[in-house]
């Protein structure tokens, strides 16, 4: 089986995110290449950072560099063919003493088996790995919910809209939550 991995402290939001994910799965299945996503950030030192050659092709990915070569970070969403299992078993700890996902991505890059897609202005990526970034993400989600009057990522609504549960099941789930703001 192919593999999708998302870092637990990452939040993605934007119109078309579902189709982006479906397309990534199809791309990996068809090409047998890994797929990652790049995103422009103001503080690239916190992330795996993409560097480019003169033709704007990805040249390398460096984890949390002191001197970033670009402002494009690799977000915490990765799609891999099943070959990642074998590759991951061979990864050694980095200079920071950690097993880095960037090491895996660089192996795919070196073997010309890494596709990078850049998330545009219609998408938001939030890494909540620091107290400040967690607060920022909370405020962002709160602003969306208050302005639109809709909750973001209600799992019950999502599974109902996808046809995984019927109206009666949705109603039963909602009854348990009726006294909460959710």
Q: Where are the predicted features?
A:
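Catalytic-core segments of class I nucleotidyltransferases/pyrophosphorylases
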Residues: 4, 25-26, 57-157, 168-169
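Conserved beta-loop-beta/alpha segment of the NTase-like Rossmann-fold superfamily
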Residues: 1-54, 79-82, 87-91
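Short, amphipathic C-terminal "tail helix"
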Residues: 165, 169-182
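Short, solvent-exposed polar/charged micro-motifs at secondary-structure junctions
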Residues: 45-49, 125-129, 162
């Amino acid at each position: 089986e192919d593999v999708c991995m998302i870092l637990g402290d990452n939040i993605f939001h934007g119109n078309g995110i579902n189709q982006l994910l479906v397309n990534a799965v199809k791309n990996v299945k068809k090409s047998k290449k890994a797929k990652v996503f790049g995103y422009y950030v103001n503080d690239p030192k916190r992330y795996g950072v993409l560097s480019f050659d003169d033709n704007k092709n990805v040249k390398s990915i460096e984890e949390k560099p002191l001197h970033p070569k670009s402002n494009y970070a690799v977000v915490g969403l990765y799609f891999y063919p099943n070959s990642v299992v074998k590759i991951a078993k061979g990864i050694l700890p980095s200079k920071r003493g950690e097993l880095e996902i960037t090491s895996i991505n660089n192996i795919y890059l070196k073997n010309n088996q890494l596709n990078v897609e850049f998330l545009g202005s219609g998408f938001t990526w939030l890494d909540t790995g620091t107290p400040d970034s967690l607060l920022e993400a909370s405020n962002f989600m709160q602003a969306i919910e208050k302005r639109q009057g809709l909750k973001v990522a209600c799992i019950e609504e999502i599974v109902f809209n996808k046809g995984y549960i019927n109206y009666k099941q949705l109603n039963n789930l909602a009854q348990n939550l009726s006294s909460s703001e959710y």
